[in-house]
Amino acid sequence: MAAPWISKVKASGKLAVFVSDAVKRGAWANAFTQAFAEFNRLAAGGKFGVTLTLASSPPDPDGLGGADVNFDVGDGRTTFKAMGQEFSVNVLGSQMHGHTQVVGFGDGNGKVTEVIKSFVFVPAAPTINSGPAGNQIVRPVGDAIRTFIAVHEFIHCAGLSNSDHSPGNVPDVFLGQPQPVSGAKPQDDKMLLFLGNPNIFAPPITVSSRTTGVIQGLWPQQP
């Protein structure tokens, strides 16, 4: 279930994102830049009530300071510290989706009721099968799929959980299980969101009124 951010962050209408060196200097650099801009474009058009900014320092491991969101790559068991506690997540480095771990106040039953910090891990080297049947190779995915993955995780950062994923009949970037489709070249790779007549692919990246409504319910509209 979706959860709002703490009041200080919610009132600002901004999420400050710290980007790791592994992202800035690696294969995710271009996709991160594109996804950052794409989320803000969608946020402006849909009046989400929240936009992304860049932070110069990571989240304080022992308190409320630093960035709100940490964006990093993951491959295997990855650990981090927040609010004085150690956390770990397991990210398969070749998979086609990321993982967003929120840290926040809870209800005592494992449910987060207010988000304090958010940690995004995208797969270090997502791969796709490409080529004609019987002669396929496994290669890195193109930036379009990486960008899709990152925008999806940014929506999680806004406060949405897996239970808020878009259903199959409302295909958008927050779909739970989009299907990767390889192109003749990595730059032609895309995500299949809906198999029908016609098929619906991303790019372009879109957000439905359903997803927009959930986000708006968590963030006060800025003047």
Regions found by a protein language model. Give the residues of each.
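Disordered inhibitory propeptide/activation segment of secreted metzincin zinc metalloprotease zymogens
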Residues: M1-A27, F36, R41, L92-K111, ...
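Bulky hydrophobic/aromatic "packing anchor" residues in well-ordered structure
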Residues: V17, F39, V120-V122, P171, ...
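Metzincin-family zinc-dependent endopeptidase catalytic domain
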Residues: A29-P180
